[in-house]
Amino acid sequence: MSAPTPVLLMVRELDLGGSERQLAEMAMSLDRSRFDVRVGCFHAAGMRGEELRAAGVPIVEFPVPSLASFKGALRIAAYVREQGIRLVHTFDTSANLYGVPAARTAGTTRVISSQRADRALMPPLYRHGLRVTDHLVDAIVVNCEFVRRHMIEEEKAPAGLIHLCYNGIDTSVFRCIRGARPQGLQDASLVVGVVCALRPEKGLETLLDAFASIRGLEPGVKLVLVGSGPCLADLQHRARTLGILPDCLFEAATPRVAEWLQAIDLFVLPSLSEALSNSLMEAMACGCCAVASRVGGNPELVRHGETGMLFQPRDTAGLAQALRLLIHDGSLRGKLASQAACAIRSRFSREASAERMVEIYTGLLG
């Protein structure tokens, strides 16, 4: 039997974040008999680093004080050559901008980048830099059909370079179980909620406004927002102004994501922009009834009327209408939640994602 193929997966850091999570899931899911997986990063501290070490995945830190650091690039290139790395796969913007050129100088190594978001939201300098690195890679992996179209139609990337590999989640962790609700929600009759970063593009004002219009429908209904970010104070002020703060719970970002999702009945993702949302997939896997804005990759996860409900971004009335229907009709709520959980288990498990990525890797390695 031939020796496992050395591969290096790269990301800026190993803490909370969607790209960091997907890298960790992939590193732990790839067949060790076929791939000698190492993880490279600029900053090794963080929760994902702890998970990877516990799983026995080697972590190599390449200190990079800034993207202009030439020494850091030389270290990456030297490591790739010395270790005989045959494939380098970068998972986020910083790794794409810095790791791709460094790995390319190492010679025969195959280089893959990732695109997991709409580049229109990026600073122009970053977007230009990524367009340059698009011409240095052997493949670009995207996580949804929306991003694939964006890369071809707007970024003018060659269609043959683009490979679709949906994100995968650990369905042994994110599963349909209902236990005791966390503190602050024990007395709730029904919980509406979201788990996400509290950033402007998440459109969370729409959720607060819609909740204000429907909270009287069900005695004891509560709203929970789990996450941290720059919009926290503004969202709390808005909840206070709307008079709903007593029925709202703001919980900081936590690694106990599954526990919170399993306490939510109606998961609402009102994003203004989205690629493929890990939190939406995880919520559906946990048995939440999903309600999401019709943007980006959300419709690839939520089929309206089958695995959840969709509404137009910023449409407070449309979201409120969906919430009223689902609060009143428990049978429909349960049906949509059950069908969503089945869809996630069958199409978006980390095993399915790893199988697809292996197809991409082996196709490039020959």
Question: Whereabouts are the PLM-identified features?
Answer:
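A conserved mid-protein helix/loop that constitutes part of the nucleotide-sugar donor-binding site
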Residues: 17-28, 190, 194-213, 230-237, ...
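Short hydrophobic beta-strand element within catalytic cores of glycosyltransferases
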Residues: 41, 289-292, 302
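Acidic anion/phosphate-binding donor-loop and adjacent secondary structure
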Residues: 67-71, 149-154, 160-161, 166-183, ...
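A conserved, positively charged/aromatic
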Residues: 110-141, 149, 156
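A short, well-ordered alpha-helix in the C-terminal region of glycosyltransferases
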Residues: 220, 318, 325, 332-347, ...
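Nucleotide-activated donor-binding/catalytic signature segment of Leloir-type glycosyltransferases, i.e.
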Residues: 236-252
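Aromatic "clamp/platform" in nucleotide-sugar-dependent glycosyltransferases that forms part
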Residues: 253, 272
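Conserved acidic donor-binding segment of nucleotide-sugar-dependent glycosyltransferases
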Residues: 304-305, 309-316, 325-331
